[in-house]
Amino acid sequence: YAQGYFDYDSKKSGGLTMSHLRFGHTPIKSTYYISQADFVACHNPAYLETYDMVQDLKKGGSFLLNCPWDAAELEERLPGKVKKFIADNEINLYTIDGFKIGKEIGLGTRINTVLQSAFFSIAKIIPEEDAIKYMKDAATKSYSKEGEAIVKMNHDAIDRGATGYVKVEVPASWKNAVDDSVKHVATGDRPDLVEYVNNVVIPVNTFHGKDLPVSTFETVSYTHLTLPTNSRV
């Protein structure tokens, strides 16, 4: 059995999408977000600075990061709180350069097939050889009308994704990493708007809206007209 819930913001084109996936041997009736995940993938390394990408992983879980960084660059670029969480919770860390793979095989920035194949290889939801076969069968069915070259590109993406990731040895020093993240705060000459942006807009934009108490919200049905500008804080 499988369950999928796809959470995305109002800026669908180029916006953030989160896929909550559950698998099991019995019917799945959960009606809530996953908060104890076995596997999390981050397809855009820029998200590490804005969202809590690893906080919902259970101890011993796996984190796949799509990035072009080697071990030295990971040490430099990973936020301190991410490094500490990974080390403290014995997270299995993997990296894959999906964009490089996509470019090499002719798919450009379309990396979903590459990352999906890496997921099945790491997560072991089903035997890897079965997952690869099913993915290739689906790609053939979906793209056969586009021509043999397109089908081959997608088959190559599946093969490269299943073998193109690297398991990172997590340094013991990461346990002592310091949270060096920058907290974004709105300022201005309108106290009511500043308060609303800091207490509501920023938490919602960083996907902490579900943690806000009811008392945070206005009791009247209006919103500030300048919110599109402030939503980019």
What residue spans do the PLM features occupy?
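Glycine-rich phosphate-binding loop
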Residues: P27-K59
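ADP-ribose/adenylate-binding Rossmann-like module
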Residues: D56-V82
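Short alpha-helices
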Residues: R77-S142
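Ferredoxin-type iron-sulfur electron-transfer modules and their immediate structural context
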Residues: A131-I132, S144-R232
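Short glycine-rich anion-binding loops that position phosphate/pyrophosphate groups of nucleotides
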Residues: P45-Y47, W69-D70, F99
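Anionic-ligand anchoring segments at beta-strand to alpha-helix junctions in alpha/beta enzyme folds, i.e.
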Residues: Y1-V40
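Redox-cofactor binding/interface segments in oxidoreductases and associated redox assembly factors
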Residues: C42, L65, Q116
